[in-house]
Amino acid sequence: MKKLYLLIAFCLLVFNLQAQFTIEKIHFESANPYSFNDIITDLENQEKQKVFGELVIPLDSIGDGKKYPLIIGVAGSLGWGEHHYKYLEMYQEMGIATFELNSFKSRSITSTVGTQNEITMAAMILDAYRAFEVLAEHPRIDKNKVSITGWSLGGGVTLFSAWLPLKEAINKELSFASHLALYPPCFIDPDNTDFSQSPIHILIGELDNWTPSAPCSDLVNKLSSKTNISLTTVSYTHLTLPTILLV
């Protein structure tokens, strides 16, 4: 019986070691461009901005020098909510590091609902790439396996971070491995249709009247001939889509 207790205790110890996480607050410098054009034509002259986020690495006790894939998460117009954290926890349980980008808190903003001008999508895209640049140098992160996901406004950040005129104005060297945009605003219809060749996937609710699905369908059809982009429209679903998917 004593041996059985020892075996159980050992198994619990091994599980706990393998389930450990390290949490780091990462600070970096970004800026406050108002528009995409500010980034493309005048990035160096934009007002500088200190930004931070939280990096969580699900340490594997077996592989001491292991580098982890990473997902950078970008919240929507109300900032970070419970369902966003459930996604990050899901990724962490899969052995993927996560980075909670805090574009709002860094600027003392709680919400942009109804205005959308306290911080713009352009500034948040810049934040995401500046975070990527810092995290690419982290000893536990595999810079070739860094993806981005976001919700609503953050979904727009995720989607248009793949637009090459923006990406190349910010950083020509680093590319996100994939882009998962959850109910993004797809109202931007660029004449230049050059997007990253990394996989881009849009997930949206058919009945969503805040970020409608039709513009996303139109955009995917426009880009699909030369871009690795796809769309999933969930029938009879509104903005509560991410919560439904996690039940």
Question: What positions do the PLM features span?
Answer:
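Primarily recognizes the serine-hydrolase "nucleophile elbow" in alpha/beta-hydrolase
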Residues: Y129-S196
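N-terminal cap/lid segment of alpha/beta-hydrolase-fold proteins
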Residues: Q20-G63
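Conserved small/polar residues in nucleotide/adenosyl-binding loops
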Residues: T237-T243
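Serine-hydrolase catalytic machinery in alpha/beta-hydrolase-like enzymes
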Residues: T41-E44, V51, K66-A136
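Short beta-strand/loop motif that positions the catalytic acidic residue
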Residues: I202-I204
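Acidic catalytic loop of the alpha/beta-hydrolase fold
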Residues: L207-T211
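Short alpha-helix in the alpha/beta-hydrolase fold that links the catalytic acid
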Residues: P212-N221
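Sec-dependent N-terminal signal peptides
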Residues: L4-F15
